């Protein structure tokens, strides 16, 4: 069975957490998620989440730690999910993917 590694970012500021809703043209449109995405070939988990945050939110982030990981099995695919706490970020957060 195919295994896909996915990263997600836990961004907390003043007791609020950032979650994003998937855009209307995306798979699972309208569902809520932490920002992040799939690991590319020859990419580390840390590099993946930093790249995804730059692509999706136009921010440069500093990782705090790996918070948790979870394995989700669908009919045809296994997803290994890795959630990172974000220590700090810079840039004006722009939503480039979600609605």
Regions found by a protein language model. Give the residues of each.
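Conserved N-terminal beta-strand and adjoining loop/helix that marks the start
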Residues: 1-18, 38
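A conserved beta-turn-beta hairpin within the catalytic core of GNAT-like acetyltransferases
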Residues: 26-30
């Amino acid at each position: 069975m195919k295994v896909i590694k996915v990263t997600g970012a836990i961004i907390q500021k003043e007791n609020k957490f950032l979650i994003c809703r998937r855009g209307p043209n995306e798979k699972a449109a309208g569902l809520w998620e932490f920002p992040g995405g799939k690991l590319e070939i020859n990419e580390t988990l840390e590099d993946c989440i930093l790249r995804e945050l730059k692509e999706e939110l136009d921010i440069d982030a500093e990782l705090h730690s790996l918070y948790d990981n979870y394995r989700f099995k669908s009919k045809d695919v296994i997803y290994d999910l890795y959630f990172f706490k974000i220590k700090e970020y810079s840039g004006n957060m722009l939503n480039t993917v979600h609605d």
